[in-house]
Structures are given as structure tokens and as C-alpha cells.
């Protein structure tokens, strides 16, 4: 996942785009690998990042939510709600599928049978490519993206990434 996050950092460096990281390793890795973007970390809030992103997108912000497969099913209500606003928001949900719940010990998620892409599509998201597996394809997929989009990135598991300092979690505000 880190190489994809570094790509996002380089592509959206100092741009007016809000990145929301779901709880766990997605947010940890965003903190470590995306220092030049406007990030908000949903520490301790599994399943709320997409809804927060939708609220910010409805207020006129360009939003990219970065999340993992372990929490994807917790966004079901948010997915269908976002789909109702497909023509009114600039919101991209990037699902990083590593088939693990890394932050709680690396348990397998066993969710591939759910069909993430079909769930997103049936909720009203436009799916950009079916599955992205390389940074090169990711760069072209994310370039000039707008509207309500869903991107599924199949990735591996990175080494342990340190937690952000507590003061970052407590004082993080939108810029």
C-alpha cells in the first residue's frame, strides 16, 4: 500500500484535496507516506470515514477516502447514501485490499466473496478499472478523477508502520 500512497502524495502535493484515512494501518501509512497532502485520520472510528468524506464532499470539497478491506463492510450504509448524491459530489473511495486486518494482528478478512466492486457499483459509484495492481496503472487511474468514483487496489502487506503521535490524532483539523 505504501507505494500507492507515495504516488498519491506526489500527485496531489499541496493541492486542495482532502484525504480521509480510515482507522488502522491505512491512516498510519497515510501519516508516514503522505506528508504533503491535507489528511484527516479517523483514529478509533472503524466505518465512519466514508460518511465523513461524503459530508465534506457535499460541502464542496474534493475528497479521497483511503480505506482497507477489513472495514469495507462497515461502510455499507455510507456507500448507498453516497450513491444518492453521485451527480453532486466529488468523492473517490480507494479500497486497499490486502486481504488482512493488519492493525489487529494480521487476520485474514475472508471477504473476497462479497465482491467489493459489485457492491460499490450497485451503490451508485462509478468503478474506475476493475482492480488496480500496479502503481503505473494507479497513476493513470487517479489522474484528473472527479465525481463519485470507486477504485479497488490489490496490494500486499507492508512492514509495521508506526502509529502517528497522539498530538496529531488529537489536534488534526481540516486546513
Where are these regions (language model features)?
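Conserved thiamine diphosphate
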Residues: 107-141
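General beta-strand structural signal in soluble alpha/beta enzymes
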Residues: 18-23, 41-42, 65, 129-132, ...
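Long, charge-dense
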Residues: 96-106
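Glycine/aspartate-rich loop-and-adjacent alpha/beta segment that forms the canonical ThDP
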Residues: 1-3, 33-36, 144-175
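Generic beta-sheet signal
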Residues: 17-19, 63-65, 91, 145-155
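Thiamine diphosphate
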Residues: 28-98
Amino acid at each position: 500500500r505504501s507505494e500507492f500512497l507515495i504516488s498519491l502524495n506526489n500527485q496531489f502535493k499541496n493541492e486542495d484535496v482532502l484525504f480521509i484515512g480510515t482507522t488502522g494501518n491505512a491512516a498510519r501509512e497515510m501519516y508516514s507516506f503522505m506528508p504533503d497532502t491535507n489528511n484527516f485520520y479517523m483514529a478509533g472510528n472503524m466505518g465512519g470515514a466514508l460518511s465523513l468524506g461524503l459530508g465534506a464532499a457535499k460541502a464542496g470539497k474534493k475528497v479521497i477516502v483511503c480505506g482497507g478491506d477489513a472495514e469495507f463492510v462497515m461502510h455499507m450504509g455510507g456507500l448507498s447514501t453516497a450513491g444518492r448524491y453521485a451527480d453532486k459530489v466529488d468523492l473517490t473511495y480507494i479500497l486497499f485490499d490486502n486481504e488482512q486486518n493488519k492493525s489487529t494482528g494480521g487476520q485474514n478478512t475472508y471477504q473476497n466473496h462479497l465482491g467489493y466492486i459489485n457492491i460499490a457499483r450497485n451503490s451508485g459509484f462509478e468503478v474506475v478499472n476493475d482492480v488496480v495492481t500496479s502503481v503505473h496503472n494507479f497513476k493513470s487511474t487517479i489522474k484528473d478523477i472527479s465525481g463519485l468514483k470507486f477504485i479497488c487496489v490489490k496490494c500486499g502487506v507492508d512492514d509495521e508502520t508506526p502509529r502517528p503521535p497522539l498530538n496529531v490524532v488529537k489536534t488534526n483539523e481540516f486546513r
